[in-house]
């Protein structure tokens, strides 16, 4: 599970309720709530390595930097690198700025031979084409609108496939937990027949 704009109390409560391991790296102080917030990775699998990636460029107006939270997870003896991501929004940054931020994540992912999952709020649909050009699969390409009129929440993968019997989609009911509709994908490593990883944001 990849979460964005969450504080320490929130991620602890969710992890405790669902009996999940987690890693959370706050990025900045929320401008109205005045609490640290940032992205988190939650998983039922053991977390063996973590890191915080500081993304380039400050958002216009707020002068805050975004970050990504990365975790290497041991899934049945195999490693998977997972990134929880929240790129700068459309009103505070250009498409080129978001591509620069994506490049920081892609460069870090290039250092591992593990399969990779990059999930979160990208504040863009077009950023998916950028990930595709970099060799990533885009299982959530067709999930539809995830906030208002926009499709901004996505999952990108390297070294993992979609099983024929499942795929990707979004949760219609959020019960007030977010203004976004979370997306999900069920993924398997090449050459396997059973689901190995279920990713959501």
Regions found by a protein language model. Give the residues of each.
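N-terminal, active-site-proximal structural segment of metallo-dependent hydrolase catalytic domains
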Residues: 2-17, 31-32, 99, 103, ...
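Aromatic- and acid-rich polysaccharide-binding/catalytic face
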Residues: 80-86
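Active-site flanking residues adjacent to catalytic metal/cofactor-binding acidic residues
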Residues: 4, 85, 119-121
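Structured beta-strand-rich core segments of catalytic domains in phosphoester-bond hydrolases
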Residues: 2-79, 167-169
């Amino acid at each position: 599970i990849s979460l964005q704009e969450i504080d320490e109390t929130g991620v602890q409560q969710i992890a405790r309720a669902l009996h999940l391991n987690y890693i959370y790296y706050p990025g900045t102080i929320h401008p109205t709530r005045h609490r640290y917030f940032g992205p988190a990775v939650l998983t039922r699998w053991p977390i063996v390595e973590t890191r915080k990636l500081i993304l380039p460029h400050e958002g216009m107006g707020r002068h805050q930097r975004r970050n990504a939270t990365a975790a290497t997870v041991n899934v049945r003896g195999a490693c998977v690198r997972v990134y929880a991501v929240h790129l700068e929004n459309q009103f505070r940054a250009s498409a080129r700025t978001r591509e620069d931020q994506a490049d920081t994540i892609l460069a870090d992912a290039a250092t591992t031979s593990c399969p990779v999952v990059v999930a979160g709020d990208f504040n863009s649909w077009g950023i998916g084409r950028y990930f595709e050009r970099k060799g990533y699969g885009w299982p959530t390409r067709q999930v539809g609108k995830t906030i208002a009129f926009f499709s901004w929440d996505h999952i990108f993968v390297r070294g993992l496939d979609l099983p024929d019997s499942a795929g990707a989609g979004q949760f219609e009911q959020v019960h007030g937990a977010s203004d976004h509709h979370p997306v999900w994908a069920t993924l398997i490593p090449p050459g396997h027949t059973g689901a190995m990883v279920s990713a959501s944001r």
